[in-house]
Amino acid sequence: MTTGFLQKIFGSRNQRLVKQYQKTVAAINALETQIETLTDDQLRGKTGEFRQRIAAGESLDKLLPEAFAVCREASRRVLKMRHFDVQMIGGMVLHYGKIAEMRTGEGKTLVATLAAYLNALAGRGVHVVTVNDYLAQRDAEWMGRLYNFLGLSVGINLSGMEHDQKQAAYAADITYGTNNEFGFDYLRDNMVYETDSRVQRPLNFAVVDEVDSILIDEARTPLIISGQAEDHTELYVRMNALPPLLERQIGEEKADGTGVEKPGDYTLDEKGRQVFLTESGHEKAERMLAEWGLIGDGESLYAPQNITLMHHVYAALRAHTLFHRDQHYVVQNDEVIIVDEFTGRLMPGRRWSDGLHQAVEAKEHVKIQSENQTLASITFQNYFRMYAKLSGMTGTADTEAYEFNEIYGLETVVIPTNRPPKRIDKQDQIYKTAKERYDAVIRDIRECHERGQPVLVGTTSIENSELLSHLLKQAGLPHEVLNAKQHAREAAIVAEAGRPKRITIATNMAGRGTDIVLGGNVEKQAAFIEADESIPADEKARRIQQLHDEWETLHEQVKTAGGLHIIGTERHESRRIDNQLRGRAGRQGDPGSSRFYLSLEDPLLRIFAGDRVRAIMDRLKMPEGEAIEAGIVTRSIESAQRKVEARNFDIRKQLLEYDDVSNDQRKVIYQQRNELLEAHDIAETIGAMRHGVISEVVRQFVPAGSIEEQWDLPELEETLRNDWQLDLAIQEMVNESSSINADEILDAVTTAADEHYEAKVALVGRESFSAFERSIMLQTLDRLWREHLAALDHLRQGIHLRGYAQKNPKQEYKREAFELFAAMLDAVKQEVTRIVMNVQIQSPEQLEEAAEQIEEQGGQLGNVEFQHADFAAAAAAATAGGAVVADATAEMVSHAMSHSGPAGEVPRVGRNDPCPCGSGKKYKHCHGKLN
């Protein structure tokens, strides 16, 4: 109450910021007359003048009014577009490292030019980040004319580009590209063996377009560079036969034994998107696997040697029960292709990890591709937080303002619209069944069609869009379908979606980034005529003028009919995505309307609000085909959406806290790699490692401060001779001296190791040997880091079980991850020292040969893939307390269970050994009981 009273007097934080920025806009407008008098060359010369002033110490903030005025004038001359005052405010918000929420059609692409131009003057690079290659290329070419006019260079960073093209793109003043490609380039730069192979400069300033999609929707899914691991193709095929033999249990058993409506072998948690075997399910699965010869008779799935089988059982179950064709994926050209749950786009090249993708391939009887081992990974959360300054734009950020601030430290500023919005958002209509809902949707579409009003119908899946398309065909209504299967025609369909009587069905936000103009997009049609060289210039001008005249007529016709009408056939989990769909109508003060049609069979209502709404309908004795249209119901649905949003935020926050652990370690490893790449000579580093390793070896047999009776000299001599190529008569040395102590023995061995090393260097020369050392160091670091990533995945999947032992899973994860990291760094020192001490060389040629052999044995894996793993299934593993993260991260990266090498081995456990689950109990009293 007090807050509301104070806001009335002083205004909200947002209002105060906008008022503050309006003062700067007044200063920019005051410069406009003066800037307009400049010639093109004088205007272009301003860029050089600004750069000199920055070099002399002037701040970007002080330059802002002049730079913005210059950019606006250049845009007016080159693009024939003058920035509105509200766009100037948007540019300031971006420059100050905040998020600008601007309504659809308010010109976000043009707004980005202001902040990009100003920050590019400093010469440290600006990245403009978009959601797909099409938008990156379109915006770079479109806005590039403005930047080039002002003397700035523009680069485009697309997937599949050559190395030198990428370097040139990043060297440009302003670089356009996709979030995936910027992230992958960062990871690739930290896998190179030469400094010249890197493409990125230090991360300076990023403007993220559709910031909510990139920093929130995709925040939970890491970018992964992976290589092929061990092949388990046959196992996936065998396991695919299991789920059809199992029956679903309806209802959960309560403490008093009630609650199960129909007994079965597995339970499905739709809210959490998880599947669990029941006791009878375990028994049946074990019986079937024993029959197929995959486990021994009477063996448990929980026996340590069968843990990998357990992973395959659950992967097959989830593939059959949680992932559905044409909703979560499509099958094209003998491949399973993921459908993005947020945009409805196809994502070729991306794969679910943790064996799930292979299980789906087995289910669909297509070619099963091998599992992958993670070589490098990073989440968008951690990648974008590395920029010195980060900002973003979107049409819908206010609902997620808390998360932007909490995770990224980004404040959201709602920018006023240039013209007051005229869109009418009608009350939701809720029906009992999906059939009744679709009947109502068809009626609404027919009415709009008859009065010449264009309609955009939003659906949540390809399956629903094709069902609606079928119903429209039956009703004799011509329409276009915009889903992942029509991806290639997307821009053309969106361009024409605003024409009279046009009906367009779109999955989620497919087509985002392209405005729907009432009357159709005349610019697109004009561009085709302009590009046709066979048409004479005067004929071109006549045809383009004719197009504009026709468009004016159509534009007025659509406005009279009520503008674009948006129909939502289902509420999304997030209010933000609903708002994005609504936001396609009513751009720049145009008329428009929106309405959502829901049914009690929709997942959101069924899981979160169905019982309450059904009770209201029953109480009101609603006849079939009659809808509820009441504020109380709409509020109930929004409350359900808020619950889902809060839950997803908690998952993202938890994931970030876990990922921060590996992120800190990643920073250390990548910093070490960069230092190694840039160092002229690493002899000092190698020497420190050697001394540390030799000291550890000697102390095993001759402890510090010990007496002669405690020494094991024969064993020390043998170890030094066999493992380190040091043939020392230490026993003889001790016999000849009456007062030698443990420290003197260590000094003698260290000196011998130094001499052995120097002798090798002398044979081939310092420069050649230093290059060999660098190569060995990088290869060893990369190989052990890969194994460490696999071990962390392993650890993360089981860490939630510590909650049952009254331990904090998060703290346990941090502690054990640190121990694993320390062990990995020790292993790097041991391995590098062992190779350097043991290598036998006589010439520089032999040295190169040795480096190549080591690279073949432990270098990068083959068939490297770049994935942005889908998180749809994993996002929901929200079980109680600390259990959230373990399941939630199950899909995040391919885990180590099936990998070869130490990280993937599951050792046999003795009955009296601690149980591998981490409970602290003996194996025989814990999981051993199940055997």
UniProtKB/Swiss-Prot annotation:
EC number per UniProt: 7.4.2.8
Binding site for Zn(2+): C915, C917, C926, H927
Cofactors named for this entry: Zn(2+)
Entry keyword set: ATP-binding, Cell inner membrane, Cell membrane, Cytoplasm, Membrane, Metal-binding, Nucleotide-binding, Protein transport, Translocase, Translocation, Transport, Zinc
GO BP: intracellular protein transmembrane transport; protein import; protein targeting; protein transport by the Sec complex
Transmembrane segments: none
Catalyses which reaction(s): ATP + H2O + cellular proteinSide 1 = ADP + phosphate + cellular proteinSide 2
Subcellular location: Cell inner membrane; Cytoplasm
Membrane topology type: Peripheral membrane protein
Cited InterPro entries: Helicase_ATP-bd (IPR014001), Helicase_C-like (IPR001650), P-loop_NTPase (IPR027417), SEC_C_motif (IPR004027), SecA (IPR000185), SecA_CS (IPR020937), SecA_DEAD (IPR011115), SecA_motor_DEAD (IPR014018)
Predominant subcellular localization, coarse grouping: membrane
A GO cellular component annotation in the UniProt record: cell envelope Sec protein transport complex
Cofactor binding, note field: May bind 1 zinc ion per subunit.
Binding-site list for ATP: Q87, G105, E106, G107, K108, T109, D515
GO molecular function term, any single one: protein-exporting ATPase activity
Broadest EC class assigned to this enzyme: translocase
Description of how the protein assembles with itself and partners: Monomer and homodimer. Part of the essential Sec protein translocation apparatus which comprises SecA, SecYEG and auxiliary proteins SecDF-YajC and YidC.
Its job: Part of the Sec protein translocase complex. Interacts with the SecYEG preprotein conducting channel. Has a central role in coupling the hydrolysis of ATP to the transfer of proteins into and across the cell membrane, serving both as a receptor for the preprotein-SecB complex and as an ATP-driven molecular motor driving the stepwise translocation of polypeptide chains across the membrane.
Family indicated by similarity: Belongs to the SecA family.
Protein name: Protein translocase subunit SecA
Source organism of this protein record: Burkholderia pseudomallei (strain 1106a)
Gene: secA
